[in-house]
């Protein structure tokens, strides 16, 4: 179980280099935050941020 959690909205930090702001996320992965880009209603399963943001390819 990953020790990271984040609110439905807000800022999510996982590890030293990952920071996702205003992500619609409910859990963090150790590598980064599981989140959707703005305007994305649903993320693909297993989508993770690369750097500080997710690409539109995460959207379903």
From Swiss-Prot:
It comes from Danio rerio. Disulfide bonds: none annotated. A divalent metal cation 4 binds at residues 32-33, 43, 47. Belongs to the metallothionein superfamily. Type 1 family. Metallothioneins have a high content of cysteine residues that bind various heavy metals. This is Metallothionein-2. A divalent metal cation 7 binds at residues 49, 54, 58-59. One of its GO terms (biological process) is positive regulation of cell migration involved in sprouting angiogenesis. The gene is mt2. It comes from the Eukaryota. A divalent metal cation 3 binds at residues 14, 18, 23, 28. Keywords: Metal-binding, Metal-thiolate cluster. A divalent metal cation 1 binds at residues 4, 6, 20, 23. Residues 1-28 are annotated as: Beta.
